[in-house]
Amino acid sequence: MKTRQVIPLNVTAKEFCNALGLPRRADLMMQLRDLQLVKFFKVGNKHLYPRTYIDKVQNMLLEGKIQIRTDKGEYYVIMK
């Protein structure tokens, strides 16, 4: 009997960034929240993000609607 892998509906910030191929950065996630590109909820001390926002941000990056740039170790999210 084969077992199915259960994919969680919500992910941590680390899993979110890993899915996009980015390093886990608190400032990056705060900028995405400030620009209202992602919503989150808290469980204890953890911020959890719905998995659907990974696809949304990834599509916006591919379409050139947003850019993520670095300058001296800081990450910036720029909307076009």
What are these regions (language model features)?
Residues 52-80:
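A short, Lys/Arg-enriched interface patch at domain edges and termini
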